[in-house]
Amino acid sequence: MQGNTCHRMSYHPGRGCPRGRGGHGARPSAPAFRPQNLRLLHPQQPPAQYQYEPPSAPSSSYSNSQAPSFMPPRPDFVPYPPPAAPSAQGPLPPCPVRPPYPNHQMRHPFPVPPCFPPMPPPMPCPNNPPASGAPPGQGTFPFMVPPPSMPHPPPPPVMPQQVNYQYPPGYSHSFPPPGFNSYQNNSSSFPPSANSSSTPHFRHLPPYSLPKAQNERRSPERLKHYDDHRHRDHSHGRGERHRSLERRERGRSPERRRPESRYRSDYDRGRTPPPRHRSYERSRERDRERHRHREARRSPSLERSYKKEYKRSGRSYALPVAPEPAGCTPELPGEMIKTTESWAPPPENVNHRSPSREKKRARWEEEKDRWSDSQGSGKEKNYTSIKEKEAEEVPPEKTEEEEEELLKPVWIRCTHSESYYSSDPMDQVGDSTVVGTSRLRDLYDKFEEELGNRQEKAKAARPPWEPPKTKLDEDLESSSESECETDDDSTCSSSSDSEVFDVIAEIKRKKAHPDRLHDELWYNDPGQMNDGPLCKCSAKARRTGIRHSIYPGEEAIKPCRPMTNNAGRLFHYRITVSPPTNFLTDRPTVIEYDDHEYIFEGFSMFAHAPLTNIPLCKVIRFNIDYTIHFIEEMMPENFCVKGLELFSLFLFRDILELYDWNLKGPLFEDSPPCCPRFHFMPRFVRFLPDGGKEVLSMHQILLYLLRCSKALVPEEEIANMLQWEELEWQKYAEECKGMIVTNPGTKPSSVRIDQLDREQFNPEVITFPIIVHFGIRPAQLSYAGDPQYQKLWKSYVKLRHLLANSPKVKQTDKQKLAQREEALQKIRQKNTMRREVTVELSSQGFWKTGIRSDVCQHAMMLPVLTHHIRYHQCLMHLDKLIGYTFQDRCLLQLAMTHPSHHLNFGMNPDHARNSLSNCGIRQPKYGDRKVHHMHMRKKGINTLINIMSRLGQDDPTPSRINHNERLEFLGDAVVEFLTSVHLYYLFPSLEEGGLATYRTAIVQNQHLAMLAKKLELDRFMLYAHGPDLCRESDLRHAMANCFEALIGAVYLEGSLEEAKQLFGRLLFNDPDLREVWLNYPLHPLQLQEPNTDRQLIETSPVLQKLTEFEEAIGVIFTHVRLLARAFTLRTVGFNHLTLGHNQRMEFLGDSIMQLVATEYLFIHFPDHHEGHLTLLRSSLVNNRTQAKVAEELGMQEYAITNDKTKRPVALRTKTLADLLESFIAALYIDKDLEYVHTFMNVCFFPRLKEFILNQDWNDPKSQLQQCCLTLRTEGKEPDIPLYKTLQTVGPSHARTYTVAVYFKGERIGCGKGPSIQQAEMGAAMDALEKYNFPQMAHQKRFIERKYRQELKEMRWEREHQEREPEEAEDIKK
């Protein structure tokens, strides 16, 4: 086998490191990491040294006389295992330790080499005598094979040469024992084959295997079945690949042996452990049996739990689709859609139908009606999430273990280089480990000529077509000429795009393209969506912004050397998606090579920089939350960069037509040649024993694509194919099912085959077979984008909501609702409006590609991943501008994410949808469509009640709301707090009004937008590429919000000090002013007595009384005069004890309470949006709650007034609230913010549960208006409650107001209060109690059902508290 190649791949210094590089250039050293199998050597023991030698020549003991049933091996065949070379022959020079590169830099090795277990000694055998003079355990190391999990044996013997071991930084990579030799000639290591007991057969396996788990061991019955199956006559291919049992027994002759294959014995072929994936062997005799016996011989796999049983469609043309229930609006992949798992849409829009097809259609209709009747009672089942179904099938512990197994790094090796690559150190260029040979260069030229330039040649052969220009094109041209220099208020081409942009004209223009493949197949044009241009921004706006694929801090990358693997400058990552739903298909792309099947499992990504400190990429597609993992692994070496680029252009440009996916960046398109930021390699693998993988070399993939590039139905064979038996034709059609075929020059060029039909419409004319493709019409062209349907749908939803909240529903209203529902159903059933379409194409001109839909499914995840990685790399540039490095990178991304942003495809969304519909899997499994708005929806009274009824989490919980409004809510409180504190200390003589004026000037959005511009946040913000933020005023407002979110993120992860430093640096550019702002003086009372002023208590009766309050609350103030000033009312004049009253402290205390309450709500209420959090905070930090807490603490008894009589005075609610806020400020000044947190944890936050259960977060006036709006009549202005003042009595300083509230001309409530506002609140509360509002009753029932036990406990506590004073009075009596 390829021992020498893999030997060099694995252990050349500078090439055997985790990414397969290590040579030139300044590169940070790998972090210190110590594998678990290292063992400390004795201090006096010298470090072990190892010497690896290439495999020895075949032993003469291997002779043809001993194996008469086998052909003699070819000269380059290496037996397993080879004996040690005799000293007379002279061993080959050992593998060089250091490549002969100039200025080659080695990575730092570990202090001691790893202790690997030595190879067990070979068993005695007459054909394999032990080599004399060879130390035990010494041998070659041709492959990267992990060591068995065994106890550590004694250390290996000392060898004359030392090797530097290098380990990947991210995970432990296991290596084989130094003495492991995969080519030892030990014929007795394995039992003889069943075919010839006297013939020794050899397996390329480790000399000892890992112990298997109990549940993985094959039972005797299964082993017997496995052996029986091995001797059956199952072919592995068609045509010349068909091999009978007789041929398998006699082996392959040397002259018929393929030069690129490696000779393997029948024992080896038959007993190779089955792969972890499905083994898709093709058979011409037993079509159904092959799947059955594959299931029996397949080994346990972690992907099996996610796979569904493969259901054949038989000979039927198509299966009926489920009818769409009313109100269901399916959309394209990544949007809301509703499909079934195994039903396909019926063919429609067919011009010519044969009689047999009409009979089939009648059967389809019957099955459709029968299926719809059976499903009528279970509409909601279709909305069940795929993740929930899988959670029921698979236990949670098992799912977690399987996902860990999926993400666990594996040891890999490449298939043979076959003279396409050279790994000779003398041939290397720069820091490569593999260089392409002239044979590989010829292969690249052939691939580029036959496949790479095929599309361009076909387009050039067609006559050019100039599309007619629309008014939008003229506006864009005029906008680019003027550069928008005169338009300061807008960054869009027009202020009213809806008036200028004619969507219908744009769609007609795309439909009129002469090269269009079919009317119902939509294609991609650069910079265009299905209904017009992707970007309608001005030329000035296109020069910046993430939405234009311009990532700050990106620089052009020097091109890689095309004919080498550039191992020293590329970093390799394996890409995998979890969960694997919709990515593991029943028809994967399989490449047969050397009697093995290599199954497509995803892509490898090569980056030019290490992907450190980049979080996982999460995206919603098919209504399922996916996570894209990029796992660092050992680099597969047999590839060259030019081969990767040829494949990428073939797949992404010619097949998928992703024209708007730019991996270089628009800024570098016209610059000198530069390299793409990422290279991609398809991974075709087969599983090896002990959990390893063999990756197919890149040249074999290109050869496979060249072999597959043949006509789908050759013109010269049409007549022959039409004469095939039905079974033979059905098998060919099944093989083509799911295949991607291409018609060069058409739009779109490639499509997936769902059915292949050879029925002839005209018996006199032979026609090509028909390709049937089941596609999805774009949303803009189906009922989902129809303005009439949208208008009718909105009116239907509004009427349904009104009837649900109406106390009495009229029969006419019910009929009106039913009529609208029926009208919606009719629109959905129109052929021109259906989402599912059936496309029929002639197979003439179509070519096979060898690619199936699973490759396209994985490929469409790559734009999302590359956008995610590039964005997080540019955020590192933002870290430098901020002066703070975030540890939680997702938190920084969240701060930059505007609510309008949605990460769907990472590029032009219509391009991705079209490519998925044309080339993706036919019927993806969809999750619950609610996943899109489950945590994002915040409109509607029902959503408000649902969210506001949720109690807080006991432990801090991360939020699932993926935009920055919540962080903006927190950052706003932080900015207000910092501003208030600094102004309070810097201006000790300024009154509350002046402080509030200065604070308003600092925290207003216009000023915060200026600070955001200093950080260039507009270049980093993520927001929708549309008209939302086109106007400069809207963009400035969004930038101010983004700045507040950034301050909140810094405060949340860093500290208050970090947020203070950042805010100070941005406020003042002058270092002196910044120093004044940041280093403010102490409070005047603290400056008078720097240490403490408690010595004044003895001489001051006022302070003596305050010590009682200190004992009551358990806090001893260092400067007790601060507490005295907090309790000094405004009516008290200036005195030397307090130096003023408490109005300034009230200003500071309000900001402190806002910050502490905001942080608590942000952490413990993760499902609440900004508006919901504001409602909760308003219920906590208001005069009523504050006055209640102050009264419970008895603060009114310690209030310092100018009343000489010292009589107890009943303070107003506002005065009590001011006392509490002033106390909070004094507590912060004397202690710190931690004391305030503790105080509010005890006195305020426990009240939240009562506020939520009683719905006290909603004031009576707002609640009454909400209830009245639910009773509005359709087509009329909604009736709202009106308040009228009926009476005003009392003097001017103590008046009482009487207010009544009217609804629809009827008085429904009345209230009294010391102010008009309080009287209106009383009137609204009275109306809610007396008037029978259905919405109010619904809210009460909702809370009662949800928190029945909590409400009982709360009522019991309230009754207990009310009885306590009465019991105390009875005891006194």
UniProtKB/Swiss-Prot annotation:
GO terms for molecular function: DEAD/H-box RNA helicase binding; lipopolysaccharide binding; metal ion binding; primary miRNA binding; protein homodimerization activity; R-SMAD binding; ribonuclease III activity; RNA endonuclease activity. SUPFAM superfamilies: dsRNA-binding domain-like (SSF54768), RNase III domain-like (SSF69065). This is Ribonuclease 3. It comes from Mus musculus. Ribonuclease III double-stranded (ds) RNA-specific endoribonuclease that is involved in the initial step of microRNA (miRNA) biogenesis. Component of the microprocessor complex that is required to process primary miRNA transcripts (pri-miRNAs) to release precursor miRNA (pre-miRNA) in the nucleus. Within the microprocessor complex, DROSHA cleaves the 3' and 5' strands of a stem-loop in pri-miRNAs (processing center 11 bp from the dsRNA-ssRNA junction) to release hairpin-shaped pre-miRNAs that are subsequently cut by the cytoplasmic DICER to generate mature miRNAs. Residues 70-99, 119-133, 144-159 have a biased composition (Pro residues). PANTHER family: RIBONUCLEASE 3, RIBONUCLEASE III. Degraded by autophagy in response to neuronal activity in motor neurons. Expressed in motor neurons (at protein level). Component of the microprocessor complex, or pri-miRNA processing protein complex, which is composed of DROSHA and DGCR8. The microprocessor complex is a heterotrimer; each of the two DROSHA RNase III domains binds one DGCR8 (via C-terminal region). Interacts with SP1 and SNIP1. Interacts with SRRT/ARS2. Interacts with CPSF3 and ISY1; this interaction is in an RNA dependent manner. Interacts with PUS10; interaction promotes pri-miRNAs processing. It catalyses: Endonucleolytic cleavage to 5'-phosphomonoester. Belongs to the ribonuclease III family. Gene3D superfamilies: 3.30.160.20, Ribonuclease III domain (1.10.1520.10). Residues 389-1364 are annotated as: Necessary for interaction with DGCR8 and pri-miRNA processing activity. Zn(2+) 2 binds at residues 560, 608, 675, 679. Mg(2+) 2 binds at residues 1146, 1218, 1221. The modification Phosphoserine is found at residues 354, 372. Zn(2+) 1 binds at residues 535, 537, 548, 1025. Its main location: nucleus. HAMAP family: RNase_III. It is found in: Nucleus; Nucleus, Nucleolus; Cytoplasm. Residues 47-69, 160-169, 185-200 have a biased composition (Low complexity). Residues 1-99, 119-406, 447-496 are annotated as: Disordered. Its cofactor is Mg(2+); Mn(2+). Keywords: Cytoplasm, Endonuclease, Hydrolase, Magnesium, Manganese, Metal-binding, Nuclease, Nucleus, Phosphoprotein, Repeat, Ribosome biogenesis, RNA-binding, Zinc. Pfam families: dsrm, Ribonucleas_3_3, Ribonuclease_3. The 2 RNase III domains form an intramolecular dimer where the domain 1 cuts the 3'strand while the domain 2 cleaves the 5'strand of pri-miRNAs, independently of each other.
